[in-house]
């Protein structure tokens, strides 16, 4: 069983999402629910996915005052999600409080990760918001801060994986969007890589959306991706 693939559900309706979900095997992937779907469909949709035996990554990228983020993370834990994220740019105290509030959940706590630099952002984008650093420099800075706060990992582009492993060690989880099988379009992700290359670079989990969700045969594409990385994770 492969647990490396996280399928990003980016649909406008529950019906469309479930049509995809009911075609794929929960033993071959996990599912990511982002802002659009969660805002539209709420916790009931997450429960529908869990009822189908899928682990859910609740990708809401919390970013607010520490108390508010901590309470939101606790709500995610109560929902039983597998993974939840927040913005590292919210600061050390925000991340520490979010991690602390999960202590009573023990082994049932969700994996808590941070978003460092969005994969759509380049040097100019950072400069325009007052950050005079390259995406790589900012990723490293915020990843170190996340580890210091006790978080379990970070979201990062595949090209950043190798250097983050050097800085943060083998146990810190690296979750990588910007994954495109050979032949796929890049879309709005600027820093991309194929699944085998990402695994070889050291990624723990690969977030893949449209190459699977917009495929004529999503189940076959998912099986093909898993087959392409099977010998790398055995």
Curated annotation (Swiss-Prot):
Q: Which CDD domains match?
A: OMP_decarboxylase_like
Q: Lyase: present as a keyword of the record?
A: yes
Q: Which GO terms describe its molecular function?
A: orotidine-5'-phosphate decarboxylase activity
For binding substrate, which residues are annotated in this chain's numbering? 10, 32, 59-68, 119, 180, 189, 209-210
What are the alphabetically sorted keywords of the record? Decarboxylase, Lyase, Pyrimidine biosynthesis
The protein's annotated catalytic reaction(s) are: orotidine 5'-phosphate + H(+) = UMP + CO2
What pathway does the annotation place this protein in? Answer: Pyrimidine metabolism; UMP biosynthesis via de novo pathway; UMP from orotate: step 2/2
What is the active site of this protein? 61 (proton donor)
Q: Which GO terms describe its cellular component?
A: cytosol
- Tell me what this protein is called: Orotidine 5'-phosphate decarboxylase
- Write the lineage as a comma-separated list: Bacteria, Pseudomonadati, Pseudomonadota, Gammaproteobacteria, Pasteurellales
